[in-house]
Amino acid sequence: TVVEATSGNTGIALAMVCAAKGYPFVATMVETFSVERRKLMKALGAKVILTPAADKATGMVQKAEQLAEKNGWFLARQFESEANPEYHRNTTAAEILRDFAGHGLDYFISGYGTGGTITGVGEVLKVARPNIKIIGTEPSGAALLGGQPWQPHKIQGWTPDFIPKVMNREVIDQVIPVDDVVARDTSLALARE
């Protein structure tokens, strides 16, 4: 059995892989996370265990760790595993560099959940394009990188109540807070275009 704490994105991917390989998969999620993501994981054969909102993302991680320890399950550890940013170094960053070959690339802007994307992509882009600026974004009410206390926010998959171990903060040149309502309204406007 594979177990992982997830806001849904990695959980959906793990549910697909586990279904294809015939492995049982258990996802732990905070009860306030997307019902749609839960349904999709369940449709792929996953068992979804909800943790109390008051326990935040730390609670879902602790629940996954407890289940792995108690049952001898494999814990994927997306917030800690070096495989996470390594994947983005080898694929996401390589794709960006291919797409921008012969063109300027001044900024890479990314939010963070596990920190894998901004770390892996940022590290490669800094070497390939030394003048690039890596911009991290996080909900304004949960601006941990900005030195603020964490508060619940509405941007799914972004910014748990801890700074992930896998994240290389040194690669980030600037952090920009994003308002929940503005983020929602902007995504809806872009979807309509």
Placement of each model-derived feature along the sequence:
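PLP-dependent amino-acid enzyme catalytic core
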Residues: 1-193
